[in-house]
């Protein structure tokens, strides 16, 4: 029972919407799969209404329920993936590179949709991405991982206003600035673990301030802080 409850409370949005949607199933059946497994409805009418409601919430029409994945654009397919996760009314959604396969304009639409839903329902996201500009926009807290190690963690404000680890600093310095004057003077920092002289395995987490922690040795921290 505990495992079943956890499965319904935690849902996933995948990177490639086309690869994770069954091409032989209609959208209604794709979205309702979790409802079917966990017996969340009492009649077919209720099932249909739940699918229609969640489609409306993600900006799709009820008639889209009878279409197949190949009949949608990339952004629409990702909305179907979001609907499939949301229909279970989860407490946590793990979004694994869920916007990386989309065009920039569609990325903004999907992230705005996710934020609106979060504001409305209070659910939590574990948002996995390499685009730090989007991470900054959607996240309250950030964890920076490299080669399987958590290198730096803190609030969004702590990470972006005072990045400490060289890898974090290189990632943030690579973010383009929309201001052309600032962009011309932006210096992207280069980071290569092989030549950095760092040993992630030898480091431990050090508190910088508040909830801001950085992995490194005592000698590393003396150089960085």
Q: What is each of the regions a protein language model found here?
A:
Residues 1-11, 37, 159-163:
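ABC ATPase NBD coupling module
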Residues 3, 156-224:
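Short catalytic/signature loops enriched in Gly
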Residues 45-63, 172:
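Conserved ABC ATPase "signature" region
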Residues 68-72, 76:
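Conserved ABC ATPase signature
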Residues 82, 94, 106, 110:
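Hydrophobic anchor residue at the start of the ABC signature
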Residues 87-91:
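A short, proline-enriched helix->beta-strand linker immediately N-terminal to the Walker B motif
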């Amino acid at each position: 029972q505990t495992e079943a409850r956890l499965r319904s409370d935690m849902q996933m949005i995948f990177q490639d919407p086309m690869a994770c949607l069954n091409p032989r199933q209609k959208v209604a059946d794709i979205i309702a799969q979790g409802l079917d497994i966990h017996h969340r409805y009492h009649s077919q009418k209720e099932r249909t209404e739940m699918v229609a409601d969640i489609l409306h919430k993600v900006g799709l029409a009820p008639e889209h329920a009878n279409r197949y994945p190949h009949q949608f654009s990339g952004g629409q397919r990702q909305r179907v993936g979001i609907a499939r996760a949301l229909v279970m009314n989860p407490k946590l959604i793990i979004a694994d590179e869920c916007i990386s396969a989309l065009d920039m304009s569609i990325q903004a639409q999907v992230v705005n949709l996710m934020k609106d839903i979060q504001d409305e329902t209070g659910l939590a996201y574990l948002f996995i991405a390499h685009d730090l500009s989007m991470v900054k926009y959607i996240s309250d807290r950030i964890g920076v991982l490299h080669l399987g190690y958590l290198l730096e963690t803190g609030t969004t404000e702590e990470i972006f206003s005072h990045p400490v680890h060289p890898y974090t600093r290189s990632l943030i310095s690579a973010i383009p600035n929309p201001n052309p004057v600032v962009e011309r003077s932006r210096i992207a920092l280069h980071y290569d673990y092989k030549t950095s002289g760092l040993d992630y395995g030898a480091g431990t987490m050090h508190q910088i301030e508040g909830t801001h922690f950085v992995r490194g040795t005592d000698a590393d921290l003396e150089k960085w802080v």
